[in-house]
Amino acid sequence: MKKRVYLIAAVVSGALAVSGCTTNPYTGEREAGKSAIGAGLGSLVGAGIGALSSSKKDRGKGALIGAAAGAALGGGVGYYMDVQEAKLRDKMRGTGVSVTRSGDNIILNMPNNVTFDSSSATLKPAGANTLTGVAMVLKEYPKTAVNVIGYTDSTGGHDLNMRLSQQRADSVASALITQGVDASRIRTQGLGPANPIASNSTAEGKAQNRRVEITLSPL
């Protein structure tokens, strides 16, 4: 079993080293970048920890998870967020939730038609299922802060919109916490009609503005 664990780690770290290689402009030779080296070392350590912390039956699985998380940590902040972004894109495929990158931050835009009915702060089943996928990734990559912001369109009173947007942000946060995400990582805020991403003069624009954004930032 130990040989299998080390083989898994070696394969992961080797793949990372190859993918992280660059060409030295002075020698013309391929070299491993610092992030790739760090990721490879991290994968070896992570695989060992993952295997040791798992039961005999699950050691192979534990090694794989530990190797991935260790590689992300070893490769630095940028690599850590790169891997997390890729996993989120995979989980969010076909859900209607967009994943964008801004520097080292990852932003999930959850439109209202996915998450909530009109004037409601109760998550739809589709929204709850989507957040299950988000939570799975967040638990695998715990070194990120989670900022949940609720938005509305400009229809209705300002106080009502502020309250509703806060309630929706809180509902999303509660769902993540219920799925096992550490509550200490999460902050919520309701901004009502602020920061529109489309015009509030059309029904289509209003629909885009009714959303919850989850911003992930490195700790």
Swiss-Prot record:
<feature type="lipid moiety-binding region" description="N-palmitoyl cysteine">
    <location>
        <position position="21"/>
    </location>
</feature>
<dbReference type="InterPro" id="IPR039567">
    <property type="entry name" value="Gly-zipper"/>
</dbReference>
<keyword id="KW-0449">Lipoprotein</keyword>
<comment type="function">
    <text>Suppresses temperature-sensitive mutations in BamB when overexpressed.</text>
</comment>
<feature type="transmembrane region" description="Helical">
    <location>
        <begin position="62"/>
        <end position="84"/>
    </location>
</feature>
<dbReference type="GO" id="GO:0071973">
    <property type="term" value="P:bacterial-type flagellum-dependent cell motility"/>
</dbReference>
<feature type="transmembrane region" description="Helical">
    <location>
        <begin position="37"/>
        <end position="55"/>
    </location>
</feature>
<dbReference type="Pfam" id="PF13488">
    <property type="entry name" value="Gly-zipper_Omp"/>
</dbReference>
<feature type="domain" description="OmpA-like">
    <location>
        <begin position="103"/>
        <end position="219"/>
    </location>
</feature>
<dbReference type="InterPro" id="IPR006690">
    <property type="entry name" value="OMPA-like_CS"/>
</dbReference>
<feature type="lipid moiety-binding region" description="S-diacylglycerol cysteine">
    <location>
        <position position="21"/>
    </location>
</feature>
<keyword id="KW-0732">Signal</keyword>
<dbReference type="InterPro" id="IPR036737">
    <property type="entry name" value="OmpA-like_sf"/>
</dbReference>
<dbReference type="InterPro" id="IPR050330">
    <property type="entry name" value="Bact_OuterMem_StrucFunc"/>
</dbReference>
<dbReference type="InterPro" id="IPR006665">
    <property type="entry name" value="OmpA-like"/>
</dbReference>
<dbReference type="InterPro" id="IPR006664">
    <property type="entry name" value="OMP_bac"/>
</dbReference>
<dbReference type="GO" id="GO:0009279">
    <property type="term" value="C:cell outer membrane"/>
</dbReference>
<dbReference type="Pfam" id="PF00691">
    <property type="entry name" value="OmpA"/>
</dbReference>
<keyword id="KW-0564">Palmitate</keyword>
<keyword id="KW-0472">Membrane</keyword>
<keyword id="KW-0998">Cell outer membrane</keyword>
<feature type="signal peptide">
    <location>
        <begin position="1"/>
        <end position="20"/>
    </location>
</feature>
<keyword id="KW-0997">Cell inner membrane</keyword>
<dbReference type="GO" id="GO:0120101">
    <property type="term" value="C:bacterial-type flagellum stator complex"/>
</dbReference>
<keyword id="KW-0812">Transmembrane</keyword>
<protein>
    <recommendedName>
        <fullName>Probable lipoprotein YiaD</fullName>
    </recommendedName>
</protein>
<keyword id="KW-1003">Cell membrane</keyword>
<keyword id="KW-1133">Transmembrane helix</keyword>
